[in-house]
Amino acid sequence: MTDAAHSSQTGPVTELTKALIARPSVTPLDEGCQTLMAERLAAIGFNIEAMVFEDTTNMWARRGNTGPVFCFAGHTDVVPTGDLSRWHTPPFEPTIIDGYLYGRGAADMKGSLAAMVVATERFVAKHPNHPGSIAFLITSDEEGPFINGTTRVIDTLEARNEKITWALVGEPSSTLKLGDVVKNGRRGSLTANLTVKGVQGHVAYPHLADNPIHKAAPFLAELSQTHWDNGNAFFPPTSMQIANINGGTGASNVIPGALEVMFNFRYSTEVTAEILIERVETLLTAHELDYDIRWTFNGLPFLTGEGPLLDATRHAIRQVTGYDTDPQTTGGTSDGRFIAPTGAKVLELGPVNATIHKVNECVKVDDLEQLALCYEVILEQLLC
């Protein structure tokens, strides 16, 4: 059954999600998504502050002038569509089929954004004089290089000592059904770009060259087998994965002059980036390699333990869905890593993530409406 057949039956969250999906906001574009949200929020008393940094559109919206500050955080940008011929429906023409809303960004994360807005509208209507503040931190640079997005907004807020108490990020945390998993932390991320130097030459005259691939092979073997830590009750053991490796000219008769290797750590709170860097560079020295290495720090690990935010989220999911959630720290990074270092408690709660970044991305229509109910209950638990 098509969208047209369902249009009269869809709820307010689904309708707003459709309006957002229809804006082709491939990162770092926003395409008016934040304006649409801002209009709805301004109508219920939010002060809207646009923060544009180079090609990135950000929005800081706040209702209230006192603490505590509850912040909804998310992004309006989406990943590219991929092969259009593999989509059942056009990715920027939101379509409902058999109870699922299809479109790029349906699950990641325009559905969450719509649920946040609708939940806030309902909450403010019931509690116009609520204590504390409600805020929205929205960016169009989460799926891209994450240079001019949330991190720049946080820098601005920190410079004027404007603090967030609790942040709820709308990333699609659920796995099999809505709310079965929330993310109450994330591992740190550290990337290395390593160049091992050699001497280029003819393969028939190896004594006149120095093969960096041969030299680096024992190091790479040891690196891949190194045990970094045991993890802990909240985080799995630190993982290192080689992501890219390149050497040679493409010719079969040339010994390469350099080998380039990119590898990434996803690390627990049992180690620090500094410890990992020291151990890798000690290993490089032990293998007597001539090398250059560039480190890129992508985010600290963070953890939101027992407390008001986790309690409120557990209560909301149980009340709306009838089952308990499972807090986890697995998966990739999110913009929560930029908010947590300020001292804010951060959680991620959003739709099922089975189709994110794929062709035919979709979200269950009923889940969108239930997600807004979860968000509303969380607001009531924390600000009433």
Curated annotation (Swiss-Prot):
CDD domains: M20_DapE_proteobac (cd03891)
Active site: 77, 142
Biological pathway: Amino-acid biosynthesis; L-lysine biosynthesis via DAP pathway; LL-2,6-diaminopimelate from (S)-tetrahydrodipicolinate (succinylase route): step 3/3
Catalytic activity reported: N-succinyl-(2S,6S)-2,6-diaminopimelate + H2O = (2S,6S)-2,6-diaminopimelate + succinate
Keywords (A to Z) from UniProt: Amino-acid biosynthesis, Cobalt, Diaminopimelate biosynthesis, Hydrolase, Lysine biosynthesis, Metal-binding, Zinc
Molecular-function annotations in GO: cobalt ion binding; succinyl-diaminopimelate desuccinylase activity; zinc ion binding
Entry-linked Gene3D superfamilies: Zn peptidases
One annotated GO biological process: lysine biosynthetic process via diaminopimelate
Pfam families for this protein: M20_dimer, Peptidase_M20
Free-text comment on the cofactor: Binds 2 Zn(2+) or Co(2+) ions per subunit.
Binding-site residues, Zn(2+) 1: 75, 108, 171
Family: Belongs to the peptidase M20A family. DapE subfamily.
Known role: Catalyzes the hydrolysis of N-succinyl-L,L-diaminopimelic acid (SDAP), forming succinate and LL-2,6-diaminopimelate (DAP), an intermediate involved in the bacterial biosynthesis of lysine and meso-diaminopimelic acid, an essential component of bacterial cell walls.
The name this protein goes by in its record: Succinyl-diaminopimelate desuccinylase
Organism (species): Shewanella oneidensis (strain ATCC 700550 / JCM 31522 / CIP 106686 / LMG 19005 / NCIMB 14063 / MR-1)
